[in-house]
Amino acid sequence: MDLILSFLLFILFCIDYYYVYYSSIHKYKRLNERQKAYIMSIKSSITLLILSMFVNIKYFGNFSFGFSDLTVINLGILNLIAYFFMDCVIGTKEYYKYLLSLSGYIHHIIYIIVSIVCIKLNIILPYMLFFVEELPTLILSLGKFNNNLRNDNLFGSTFFITRIL
């Protein structure tokens, strides 16, 4: 994918995250700052988890990856970059204190750089294999967004299975 097309797709993904965030806070007016901080994280985690599961099934099932598969993976990485960028942009205005930790700006900037390097070096396939690690992130984000969905045991076990083993 050439640079101009990648940039335009990145812009479209940014618009998508902007729309998802602001339509969510408009629709659910009682969301507190903490809940608002996890809206885009939930969307990004679901997207990456599904895409990573697809990649892992094909990879470990010894199926070949065609041009369309690699294009979708590239789109997934551009979507991830857009998430990190928009989380920093929107978060600066809407939920600043939730971006101050190591999981905020520093984490996002490092992952933007790593993602761009992976695209540039054409190593997006092995990079995408590891995004099954988004499962505990999704569980954590859902629990932070809605306390009824919080499950520390499920988070802990998925964290252990996907990130430690």
Where are these regions (language model features)?
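Membrane-helix and juxtamembrane interface regions of eukaryotic multi-pass membrane proteins
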Residues: 1-133, 137-165
